[in-house]
Amino acid sequence: MRIAIIGGSGVYDPGILTNIHEERVETPYGAAVLKVGTYHGEEIGFMPRHGDKHTVPPHKVNYRANIWALKMLKVERVLATAAVGSTNPEFRPGDFVIVNDFLDFTKTRTYTFFEGGETGVVHTDFTTPYCPELGQVLVETAARLGIKAHAGGVYACTEGPRFETPAEIRMIRQLGGDLVGMTNVPEVVLAHEVGLCYGLIAMVTNMAAGISSTPLSHEEVLEIMDQNGKNLRDLIMQAIPGIPRQRNCRCSLAAGKIEV
C-alpha cells in the first residue's frame, strides 16, 4: 500500500474507494483500524482519525498507533485532512489551505517515537515538516479544478477539546499562526519520524474566537465540511493519480528515522 488518507472532522468515509474491507493492525502502541480499498487500480488506505462515528476527541487520538500501523502497511505517502479555524483574514470559511508549517501548543500528548532506550536520543530535523512534493501536487490539482486552495499556511495546534479564547487567538496570530486546530500535532511529527511523506489539506470552517461574530460550535464545523465535502473529495481523487511513484523529496531521509 503506497498511499493512505487520514480523515478529520466530517471526513469519515472518502467515498472514492471500491472493494473496501476493514483492517485491524496491532502495534506496540495499541490497535489501529482502517479501511482498505481500491482507487485507480491501486490499493489505498483510509483512516478516520476520530473513529467512524467521531467518538474519539483530539487529545485522546492514538496518534502513535495510527502512524505506526501505516508504516507497517508499507505506506509511503499520507494525505491528511483537517477542519480548522482561521486567524488570517485572507483565509475564509470554505477555503482550503495546503499547510506548510506548524506551531505546537499541545500539553499532554505523547508526541514522539524516540523515548530513549533502544530508539536512542534523536533530534529530528523539522525544517520542512510537510512534504513539498505532495504540497505541490495538491496546489496544482486544486488550481486545475478551480478549487480555492492557498499555497502555504501555518497551523497552530492546541490541546482541545475546548475551542480557543480570543486572547489565545491574538497570541497565535502575533506568532505567525494562520490556522488553528486540535489534531495535526503530533500526527505530522510522528509521520516525519518514520520517514513518511505527509501532506495536510486544511479546510477553513470558521473564523477563530474573537474574530468570528458568533459563538463557535462543532455543529458549524460539520456544516461547512458537509457543504464543501464534494470539493474535498474531488481534490483528493484528482491528486492521487498525480502523486509520483518515485519520491523525489527528502521525507524518507528524516534524521533518526525509526525502522518499523
Swiss-Prot record:
Pfam families: PNP_UDP_1 (PF01048)
Keywords for the protein's UniProt record, in alphabetical order: Glycosyltransferase, Purine salvage, Transferase
Catalytic activity: a purine D-ribonucleoside + phosphate = a purine nucleobase + alpha-D-ribose 1-phosphate
Enzyme Commission designation: 2.4.2.1
Binding site for phosphate: 9, 49-50, 183
Top-level enzyme category: transferase
Top-level division of the source organism's lineage: Bacteria
Keyword Zinc in record: no
CDD domains, sorted: MTAP_SsMTAPII_like_MTIP
Gene3D superfamilies registered for this protein in UniProt: Nucleoside phosphorylase domain
Function: Purine nucleoside phosphorylase which is highly specific for 6-oxopurine nucleosides. Cleaves guanosine or inosine to respective bases and sugar-1-phosphate molecules. Involved in purine salvage.
Family: Belongs to the PNP/MTAP phosphorylase family. MTAP subfamily.
Oligomer and partners: Homohexamer. Dimer of a homotrimer.
Miscellaneous information on this protein: Although this enzyme belongs to the family of MTA phosphorylases based on sequence homology, it has been shown that conserved amino acid substitutions in the substrate binding pocket convert the substrate specificity of this enzyme from 6-aminopurines to 6-oxopurines.
Protein name (record): Probable 6-oxopurine nucleoside phosphorylase
Organism (species): Moorella thermoacetica (strain ATCC 39073 / JCM 9320)
